[in-house]
Amino acid sequence: MTEQTFILGKDAALEDSIAKFQQKLTALGFNIEEASWLNPVPNVWSVHIRDKDCPQCFSNGKGASKKAALASALGEYFERLSTNYFFADFYLGQEIANSDFVHYPNEKWFPIEDDALLPNGILDDYLLDYFBPNAELTPELLVDLQSGNYDRGIVAMPYVRQSDEQTVYIPQSIIANLYVSNGMSAGNTKFEARVQGLSEVFERYVKNKIIAEAISLPEIPKSVMDRYPSIQASIAKLEEEGFPIYAFDASLGGKYPVICVVLLNPNNGTCFSSFGAHPNFQVALERTVTELLQGRSLKDLDVFSPPSFNNDDVAEHANLETHFIDSSGLISWDLLKETPDYEFADWDFSGTTQEEYNNLMAIFRADEKEVYVMDYNHLDVYACRIIVPGMSDIYPADDLIYANNNMGMDWREILLDLPNWHHDAETYQELLEELDGQDIDDATRVREFIGIVAPKNSGWTTLRVGELKSMLHLALGELEQALDWANWTLNMNSSVFTTEPVNYYRTLISIIELHLDQNRDPAQYRAVFEKMYGKDAVKQAWAAVSEGGNPFYNLPASDENLKNFKEHQALLGAYGKLQKAKKENWK
């Protein structure tokens, strides 16, 4: 008989989950490889899996065993496939934008009939008050990045409001801008997945609250830790390696099913915190310890920040955002002080997965929070996305106005065309004025701004708005400004540039400085420049500075079909597999 391993919180054996997930991925046409494994301490495993054909599609898993980590990674992969999360930051092209459906067969399009007023039928009153308290949202802000199809309108998804089971249409733009990956889950059963999604919402909400408010937490008593010898073995190994560990009850007095573990690194005076949530205390504690080391070996524990006494810095939104991304943000010394702000609570919200779901929903009701859920079954794996306004937001609602991910929509066509080097000076001047007028951050990566997968080894992979400004000034023959932005580019990208662009920008800077010097004859220096920097770099930079040559260094041109961008086409190929499954399996 084949081995069957059951773990707390899961409704199927690990072996069955792994086999089912792997078979379904193969049937869908995804070519998954286990790219890296880590087992830095006993009972802590993590794995990184990815699609060999499309590296944008990847996931990570963690667990107390190798099988648990692989099942976790495969579950996360299905969660991201089912919710389209892998594709949330990318333009899907005109063909998909005009197809029967862009995201899901049950999406609803709301035509834009007034540039200033949101169409009727979008959101409910509660959500309108939450997302648009000052009536500042315009329809343009709710056009989704993936379709960029203003003429078609605003695309919204049907979410079920759990308080009364009513369907509410939430624009895809709001979901992608404010909630990113929070509250997404896939599982063996509906309630297993929902419990996971709700737990994640609590984990992130409580984590932010504790960090932002510098709350002091109670340690989990030794008598409670003694119940979990395998978790203690993991912690003991970390402490043996020189990393003191604190395990805290983060339930805020028994209210939320959350644990916090903090690792100190005396070697460089830094620390970092890990949070985990689940209705079962043991599962929450195990998740928190495995999360601490997900994707990290013991050598990777020296990249965090020292604790801080400046609680204003700790509470900054940018710091909380860093914690969401990789937990490397600041935490307050106050979190670690002797006297806690709450008593320890030996909480327990566990039961069957359906009972656990009901227990978690009761917490949201007590907090008077509306919960909205969209279910997905089109890949024959249950998945869901859960939105709890005021709790599961990763970014503030005003990001829709000031930092919308569709801001680059109107720029895509012209920026992709610039390297064709056939525009007039007036166009380059207008682009510079618009970049300043729209107050676009100079550090913005252009590929993210316009939603593309950059061709490997091309300048698009690292191009930022500041570097684009250098190129535009060069196109206008404005050498002093081009020089300023070339220096900015070299400084900004020093950690990401390979040797070739570093050499090109050194060459460009020297050649601009030479041509700005009225007392020197540039021709006298070309030969030595070629010896220093190489003939190819000198030829290209010299042409851009003084011979009317193309200043758009290492940028292949394209159009909005992006046919010559192989990596972007690979992403669209992966999305095509999903679109096929949606057409065939939508229930």
From Swiss-Prot:
It holds the Pfam family YcaO. PROSITE patterns: YCAO. Residues 61-426 form the YcaO domain. This is Uncharacterized protein HI_1265.
